[in-house]
């Protein structure tokens, strides 16, 4: 079975690297535990937010709180199955290690700084589902800004 390296940061990086092409793609849909986590939380692919919705912040205005929470639960499920979260607690070191491995980011890279800032911003949240969605949204938004600034350079 192929190794499943999934966490919110990989979602974000995949989204950022090809944002225009992948903006309609559902967050996490390319990963092995996606379908399992959808089933565990009683959702379908149609219920999951697109990368574009989350990176732009539209998910907050276009959806009800229950939809936000359920999407967060799917994300948390995938993070937990990959050993990156336990309940509402991050394994920050493992998240960084996996992120660096997947992205090739080097120390001082703004993407790592964004990841660290997003983890710090959400670390005290107690609800594991809301925390997971906010983390993903934070990283996606930061990566979108970084991608835009790099295009203008």
UniProtKB/Swiss-Prot annotation:
Subcellular location: Secreted
Pfam families: PBP_GOBP
Coiled coil: none
Sample GO molecular function, one term: pheromone binding
Disulphide bridges: 37-77, 73-129, 118-138
InterPro entries named in the record: PBP/GOBP, PBP_GOBP_sf, Pheromone-bd_protein_Gp-9
GO biological process: response to pheromone; social behavior
GO CC, any one term: extracellular space
Keywords, ordered alphabetically: Behavior, Disulfide bond, Pheromone response, Pheromone-binding, Secreted, Signal, Transport
Signal peptide: 1-19
Subunit and partners: Homodimer.
Family indicated by similarity: Belongs to the PBP/GOBP family.
Role: Colony queen number, a major feature of social organization, is associated with worker genotype for Gp-9. Colonies are headed by either a single reproductive queen (monogyne form) or multiple queens (polygyne form). Differences in worker Gp-9 genotypes between social forms may cause differences in workers' abilities to recognize queens and regulate their numbers.
UniProt-recorded name of the protein: Pheromone-binding protein Gp-9
Lineage: Eukaryota, Metazoa, Ecdysozoa, Arthropoda, Hexapoda
